[in-house]
Amino acid sequence: MSLKDSAKIALSLMDLTTLNDNDTDEKVITLCQQGKTEFGTPAAVCVYPRFVPIARKALKAQGTEQVKIATVTNFPHGNDDIDIAVAETKAAVAYGADEVDVVFPYKALMAGNEQIGFELVQQCKAVCQASNVLLKVIIETGELKTAELIRKASEISIKAGADFIKTSTGKVPVNATLESARIMLETIRDLNVADRVGFKAAGGVKTAEEAAQYLALAQEILGHDWVNSDHFRFGASSLLTNLLAALNGQANQKVSGY
């Protein structure tokens, strides 16, 4: 597959993201506008819960209502208070989110507690399922570090009902890597849940070339047809600029950002 071909696919799989403390309505509207490109639209935009309504309005105004709106809960620290995570998830659904990316209580798992993660995901899933909202679970691979813990967090999340497992918040030093992606994709394969569980690489995927490596990895492990927006996403912001440069045939420029 040519770089242009894979860049076009990657664009359609993006959750175009802004999760910054200084986000404003204007910045969210600009993000939505950036997603309307001559090469198509991303799968979703991802914003903080309070910006979900303004994103909905902006997407409708520009005629790209097919773009989903994702948001985050228990973010970014993955605390182990289930009640707070559930309350935040209920609020996210009430704001009108199509998808919720919840942070798994990874520190609790690192301390040996598997149950709290299962219960947190299970209860957030119940909230989402009742409103037909997709639940992605961020396991924070860069903090879990070991293959054993990354696999365990993936397994717990899947068994508790995750629709997607996601690498990272983008708020820690190490975010998505091909190594952690492989473990997560192989877990989806090994548990025989490829038909109902997807994968999201977030943070650290900056270039069309890097995106192509993730697509190739997913195709290798789960098959060519599996890689679509129902099963695969990139959480990114700066990646879009680079994908558009590749699609326009320009030299790739490194860009800063998530």
UniProtKB/Swiss-Prot annotation:
Pfam family, one: DeoC
Cellular component aspect of the GO annotation: cytoplasm
Localization: Cytoplasm
Pathway(s) the chain acts in: Carbohydrate degradation; 2-deoxy-D-ribose 1-phosphate degradation; D-glyceraldehyde 3-phosphate and acetaldehyde from 2-deoxy-alpha-D-ribose 1-phosphate: step 2/2
InterPro entries: Aldolase_TIM (IPR013785), DeoC (IPR011343), DeoC/FbaB/LacD_aldolase (IPR002915), DeoC_typeII (IPR023649)
Listed GO biological process terms: 2-deoxyribose 1-phosphate catabolic process; carbohydrate catabolic process; deoxyribonucleotide catabolic process
Catalysed reaction equations from the record: 2-deoxy-D-ribose 5-phosphate = D-glyceraldehyde 3-phosphate + acetaldehyde
Record-annotated active site: D101, K166, K200
Function: Catalyzes a reversible aldol reaction between acetaldehyde and D-glyceraldehyde 3-phosphate to generate 2-deoxy-D-ribose 5-phosphate.
Family: Belongs to the DeoC/FbaB aldolase family. DeoC type 2 subfamily.
PANTHER family reported for this sequence: DEOXYRIBOSE-PHOSPHATE ALDOLASE
Designated name of the protein: Deoxyribose-phosphate aldolase
Lineage: Bacteria, Pseudomonadati, Pseudomonadota, Gammaproteobacteria, Pasteurellales
